[in-house]
Amino acid sequence: ILVVPSAEHHLDTDLEDEVMLNFVKKVNKDAEFITSHCDGAFVLAEAGLLKNKVSTTFPTDIEKMRKRYPNLDIREDVLFVHDGKYITSAGGAKSFEAALYLCEYLYGKNIAESLSAGLVIDWDLANVAHVVIK
């Protein structure tokens, strides 16, 4: 699992960092899942990983992402999107929802609930705005 965090204050330079982008592309070949949080979705898009995928990003940056990547399907009003091996999230404190979702997906509801209790988060996937593409 590769986790791509927010690139706040470094987004422009990160999107020009060929070493990092090539690393993400290389890891993508064998990764079971790649998650992005906040503006980390821009890195996935720049690496070409979100072509023909549905994604999201930090709410106030959705329009910026749509302008930069006009051919991508970028959703708003959701906390995370799971499409294939990619899970993109709105980020911030809401990154926990995407992480708990992946834990539930991989290990079951009981494990996700146990983890959420340790984080003092009321976890119920049915109450989390999200999109899952099959």
Regions found by a protein language model. Give the residues of each.
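Active-site-adjacent pocket-lining segments in enzyme domains
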Residues: I1-K134
